[in-house]
Amino acid sequence: MKNLNICIDIDGTITDAYYWLNLSNKYFNTNISKEQVTEYSIPNVLGVEESVYAEFYENHKFQIHLEQELLPNARKLINKLSIYNNIYFVTARDKSLTMLTHGYLKKNEIAYDDLYVLGSPDKVETANQLNCDIFIEDSYDNALQLSNAGYKVLLIDTNYNRLPLNDNITRVYNWKEIYKIINKLLLQYEAM
């Protein structure tokens, strides 16, 4: 029997948070640096209309998501966690990216029990269905929503999520720290 139900976002959580920046800069003829990405809304960061970015994204989403780089230690530590825990990837990605996302995880040899491509940023209902014990996320709004619903959230630090946290959210800086926190939680769970 596996112990914890771990829900993990993908973009900016297991992958580099600024994965979209190079292609976006080239397409929109901008020169935005990672340090300038201080909010979650990509169109706002780029200074373009939502509809203009949506058209760009629709035409380039497969390329954008296929080329994402994993964060250091993400693969190794998720695979270690998967031995004794359920790993559920829960992403707001467009549903048209479901097969690509399965392929990406397989290509990168990341172990998981299931993938939920929601097409929406609302993850609370899925966390409820999965009986989530801990959620790993990069979006500040998602972290607040999940934590306000009673979930423990590990928020991966980025330039765009450095806002005040509540008691259910812990800011983390890398996958080694995430692994350590989950192992501590696992020990507490086993002691009960």
Q: Where are these predicted regions, by residue range?
A:
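Hydrophobic/aromatic beta-strand patches that form the interior of the parallel beta-sheet core
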Residues: 88, 116, 134-136, 154, ...
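Asp-based, Mg2+/Mn2+-dependent phosphohydrolase catalytic module
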Residues: 128-129, 140-192
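Substrate-recognition "cap/lid" segment bordering the active-site pocket of phosphatases
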Residues: 94-145, 149
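Active-site neighborhood of HAD-like aspartate-dependent phosphohydrolases
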Residues: 1-54
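Metal-dependent phosphoesterase signature
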Residues: 40-76
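Short, acidic loop-to-helix structural element flanking the phosphoryl-transfer center
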Residues: 62-89, 94-102
